[in-house]
Amino acid sequence: MNLASDKLEQLRTLLGGYGSCLVAYSGGVDSVFLARVAHEVLGDRTLAAIADSPSLPRRELQEALEIAARFGFPVRILQTREFANENYTANPANRCYFCKHELFEDLRPLARAEKFAVIAYGENASDTGDFRPGALAAAEFQVRAPLKEVGLTKAEIRELSAQLGLPTADKPQMACLSSRVPYGETVTPAKLRMIEQAEYVLRDLGFRDVRVRHHEMRSPEFGVRNENVAANSTLRTPHSALPLARIELAPVEIPLLLANGKLATVAEELKKIGYAHVTLDLQGYRRGSTNEGLSVASGNPA
């Protein structure tokens, strides 16, 4: 057996020792793999719980539910309330801590009520190099990270996911929509809807590694009505900030945006969504670009 296969057997043994397990599920590479293996080992003694809030794209939620149905593991949707927490919406560099704290705070009573011995989430061995406030919340709630505990890296999880036939094996890295808003700028459901719609425009044109970073340009002192913002946008008011979209694509995909009129199409569609300005980041997509300028990385590079 190769090293990844050895670790998979260690994971199965570890999960079996739990007896029962509640998995924090998102539909991403790591949590799909964890939920699939946990169900293989524990059967009906496991449950995947997905947190639904404005920070989760609707397509991601639907895809996560479809994967669970396809592979036969049970899933529960939890409506989380992080947007009621001013510590979260203020969008500090440790925003992920407050998100994960809310999630684990909701998972704990569910685990107790349905007698799951362990709560687990999908942190892996490749995550150890970052400052990860979410991991601090996990430690506070005694949430286990079995992928990390057996030393599985992201590359190995992708390899094993392919062997198990999971459609997420080559899924691009994902992160919550709130990660598109620069630290210190308030996170709101309205902003996240704009980001979500803008990224759909690009994904529907065939782009895979996509981030639309949401910035706000301040109007002059006495305010300027933004005539470019769609009439039905909540941002179309005098004295408001002017929303700017900074598009990040994989460097190899940037030439595709410049071809066949796609650049004009994207600009037009994003202005319909409500962006006053649409820009392209010439450095391309890179994880954690919102962290640039910070002394430490954030907890969820996106």
Placement of each model-derived feature along the sequence:
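Mid-to-C-terminal catalytic subdomains of enzymes
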Residues: 152, 158-202, 206-211
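A conserved acidic, glycine/proline-rich C-terminal tail/linker
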Residues: 255-270
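A short interface-forming secondary-structure element
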Residues: 242, 246-259
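Short, low-order "capping/linker" segments at domain edges
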Residues: 288-302
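Generic alpha-helical secondary structure
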Residues: 8, 104, 191-195, 259, ...
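Residues at alpha-helix caps and immediate loop-helix transition turns in enzyme cores, especially N-
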Residues: 60-61, 173, 258-262
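ATP-dependent adenylation/nucleotidyltransferase module used to activate substrates
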Residues: 1-163, 218-220, 226, 232-233, ...
